[in-house]
Each structure stands twice: as C-alpha cells, then as structure tokens.
Regions:
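Bacterial N-terminal signal peptides
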Residues: 6-16
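Histidine-/acidic-rich catalytic cores in large beta-rich domains
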Residues: 21-355
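Positively charged n-region of N-terminal signal peptides that target proteins for export
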Residues: 1-4
Length: 355
C-alpha cells in the first residue's frame, strides 16, 4: 500500500506540473475562438488531436484556456464529485479523480480490451462513479462485446458490476447493421430524477431507462424493439448524452448518422404513456453534421450548451468543430470554434471551480 500511495503521489506531482505550467505547445496549436457571452464560468472541452494534445481544457467565455489536463489517450467523459474534484475517463489510463492542482487523488486502472472502460461516466448522488465497460461473451461462434455498468467508490476502492446487457437484452434481436464485434456501443450515462439510470446505445438508436434497483429496464425509447414509440419523422440515430431533465422529459444530442438530409441537432422529447413527442430541437446555422461524439447539456437558466464535435471530412462530417449556448427560443448566446482537433468529444458547463 505504501508503494502504491507513493506512486500515486509521484504521478500526481508530475501531472500537477503539467496542469499549472504554461499552456503546452501542442495545446497552443489548437485554435480556440469564442464570441458572445457564456452563462457558466467555464466550458470543459474534451479535445483529441491525433498527433497533438489529448485531454481536457477548461475554457472561459472569451476562449482562454484557464486549466488543462493531459490524457494518455482519448478523453472519454468527465464529471465532478462533491469535493469539487474532477473524475476523468482516460482511454489509456482508466478512471482518475483529479484535484484542481491536477494531482491524481484516486485511480482505477484501465482493463483489457474485452472489458475496457469506455465512453461514459457519471457521478451519482452517493458520490460514487458509474461507468461503462465492455462485457464480452461468446455469441454465434464469435466473441461479442456487450455492455456493463460498474460502480466505483474512489474513497474505498470498491468496484462493483451493477448491470449487464446480456441479462436483459438479446443480441439476436436487439441489433442493427452496425452490430459486428461490438453489439450495442453504449455512449452515455445519466442518473434520472427517480434514481433510474439512462443508457444510450449508438448502434440501435435507442435510450433505455434502468430501474434504480438494477433489476429491470423501465422503458426503451425509439430505435430497435422500443417500448416507447417515436414518430418516424422525429427518430434519432446514433444519439449521445441522453438526460432526463425531469420525469419523462428527455434531452439528447441527435447525430442523425446515416439520415437525410445530413445535419445533427439537439432534441428534447416528452414521454406520454407508450409514445414520445418532440417538443424542442436546435440545429446549427449551416446545418452542421457530426457523424459521432458531441453533446447537449441543459443549463440552470434554461439555455442549452450544444457541441458538434467532428472535424470536417471525418466520416462524412461537415464540420466545423464548434459549440453553442442557445436560448429556448433558439437564439445563439455564445459560440466556440475549435480548430486543429480530430474530435471534441463533449463540452460540459462548469461553475464553482478555481484553477
């Protein structure tokens, strides 16, 4: 244990230097431009430059980088604990709790490819961390990556598998043309107002709600074999960041992968019995199409922070890589343009943090 703590402290010290030092050259090489007025104090931008900076940058309303954290590989999600620390998912490292100095306080190492942590974390009201990981089994004579939700307590180190797709879904039926070695491609988690957990599945264009006791799926919104139908002209495709704003009111980023005409959007639905209706949407000026990644987050004042995270030409995306704060009426209050990255996985509103 002493050696483990010493190693963590040493690594934390190394990261602290990187986080508090002048902006490194590869982060400076990314051009960040902002116009307008941002409501939260900062936006946390998840950056991935294939041959450059990889990690998280805290950007103020003027586009200035106020704080940063470098990851080993893809920055796969972020949230904050009650003490104000960030919890980051680093594809090349695992889960890390990081304080404002950039020091690692707690960590959970990445696993082998068949059980790899990926794409999504969320801090629970209990101050634990839910995260997605592959859960691989044999199916039809081949290895198939399903999904599992784990719960990690950074303070005690306890790490428990809470839910797995193999127990509640059928890979022979709950699949699409995108299903190959990976079955569902989970890409976001959210704790709903009733303690339920929302999980978004890219490959079957569906959001599910898991009961608080983990013993059942409460509903399946849109996509393959839904229990809640969405009108054909309001369907989503490859959606991200599904969140239940209040009971039966769902906000998400709809990539609209493979749909025509090609544009992406933020969209909000109200669930009423066995159906859902669209009550709000927003598309970027110019019809930005982001074939993957991206996010939509509702702010406390009712505005929405929306990120289109794919560079122009990447998997058919139109670009640019940009984010907006928009009002309920659709007016743009703030715009962020990011140039020099392959992807901007998400943009999160951040208050109450002092670098």
């Amino acid at each position: 244990m002493r050696e483990f703590l010493s190693a963590c402290l040493l690594l934390g010290a190394l990261v602290t230097v990187g986080a508090s030092a002048p902006i490194p050259a590869d982060l400076q090489a990314i051009t960040i431009t902002a116009t307008g007025a941002l409501t939260p104090k900062y936006a946390l931008v998840h950056l991935f430059a294939e041959k450059g900076f990889k990690g998280y940058a805290l950007v103020d309303g003027t586009g200035r980088v106020a704080w940063h954290y470098r990851t080993k590989d893809y920055p796969f999600g972020a949230d904050r604990r009650k003490n104000g620390n960030f919890v980051f998912m680093d594809k090349g490292h695992g889960l890390i709790e990081v304080d404002r100095r950039g020091a690692i306080v707690h960590e959970l190492k990445q696993r082998d490819p068949e059980n790899e942590m990926h794409h999504a974390i969320v801090v629970t009201p209990r101050d634990t961390v839910l995260y997605l990981a592959f859960d691989t089994e044999d199916f039809a004579g081949k290895r198939l990556k399903g999904e599992a939700i784990w719960e990690w307590n950074p303070d005690t180190g306890e790490d428990v598998k809470r839910w797995r797709s193999w127990d509640f879904m059928d890979p022979a039926l709950d699949r699409s043309a995108r299903t190959a070695g990976e079955w569902l491609h989970g890409n976001s988690l959210h704790v709903g107002p009733g303690g339920n957990v929302l999980l978004s599945f890219h490959y079957i264009n569906q959001v599910i709600s898991i009961a608080p006791d983990w013993k059942s799926i409460q509903w399946r919104l849109g996509g393959v074999r839904p229990t809640i139908a969405v009108p054909a002209d309001q369907q989503t495709s490859a959606q991200h960041t599904a969140a239940e704003l209040e009971t039966n009111r769902i906000l998400m980023f709809d990539n609209r992968t493979g749909l025509q005409p090609p544009y992406s959007r933020a969209v909000e639905y109200v669930i009423d019995g066995a159906s859902a209706r669209q009550v709000w949407e927003w598309k970027a000026p110019g019809g930005n199409y982001a074939s993957a990644v991206s996010s939509a987050r509702r702010l406390s004042n009712g505005n929405t922070l929306i990120a289109f995270g794919m560079e122009k030409g990447r998997n058919g995306s139109t670009g640019p890589t940009e984010a907006f704060e928009v009002t309920p009426a659709g007016d743009v209050k703030w715009r962020l343009l990011v140039e020099g990255v392959m992807t901007m996985f998400r943009v999160e509103p951040i208050d109450g943090f002092e670098p």
